């Protein structure tokens, strides 16, 4: 088996891992909103977690921040249509764990932010991978937060906390994104050297 075939197979396996993690982030975030937090807002409001001093957000925020990065990795390894399939599977799993209003709100928010991600990440990823992840996540987290909060709770009261919490997860992921870019560059260089 050639080195190129091995790398392609490894990329698909790596992509499958990202895909499974991404699919699981969606129901995990929805479940957390109703069950995990330092306190829960009465009368069906979300459970909240601190994301900065004096700033709270619905508890699924950190998981969604991770999902924003994972979907870029799914697209990089498997293609953008796999990320849409992951949203569908994640929504179906969410229906088993969360209130219908959360499932509808999160599915709509993930889909719209995915379309925004396509517009930003897809054209940038080959030339500027780290910039693509940062830019698409920034756009996606704002779109996702606004639509989700409006559909799930009828207000944007938690918008700043949502944005900050998701941004933290993007920032935390950047060393891994940098490592991934460097590893991919080293592999590409070794293929060129082996062919030359």
Regions found by a protein language model. Name each.
Residues 1-6, 190-196:
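Short, intrinsically disordered terminal tails adjacent to the first/last structured region
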Residues 3-21:
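N-terminal membrane topogenic signal
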Residues 103-195:
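Membrane-embedded alpha-helical hairpins and interfacial helices in multi-pass inner-membrane proteins
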């Amino acid at each position: 088996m050639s080195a190129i075939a091995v790398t392609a197979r490894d990329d698909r396996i790596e992509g499958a891992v990202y895909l499974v993690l991404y699919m699981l982030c969606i129901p995990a975030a929805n479940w957390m909103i109703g069950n995990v937090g330092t306190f829960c807002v009465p009368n069906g409001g979300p459970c909240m977690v601190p994301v900065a001093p004096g700033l709270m957000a619905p508890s699924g925020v950190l998981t969604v921040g991770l999902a924003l990065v994972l979907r870029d990795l799914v697209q990089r390894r498997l293609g953008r249509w796999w990320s849409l399939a992951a949203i569908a599977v994640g929504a179906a799993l969410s229906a088993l764990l969360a209130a219908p209003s959360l499932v509808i709100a999160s599915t709509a928010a993930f889909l719209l932010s995915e379309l925004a991600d396509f517009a930003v990440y897809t054209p940038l990823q080959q030339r500027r991978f780290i910039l693509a992840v940062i830019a698409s996540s920034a756009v996606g987290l704002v779109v996702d937060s606004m639509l989700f909060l409006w559909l799930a709770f009828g207000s944007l009261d938690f918008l700043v906390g949502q944005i900050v919490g998701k941004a933290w997860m993007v920032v935390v992921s950047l060393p891994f994104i940098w490592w991934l870019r460097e590893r991919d560059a080293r592999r590409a260089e070794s293929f060129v050297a082996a062919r030359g």
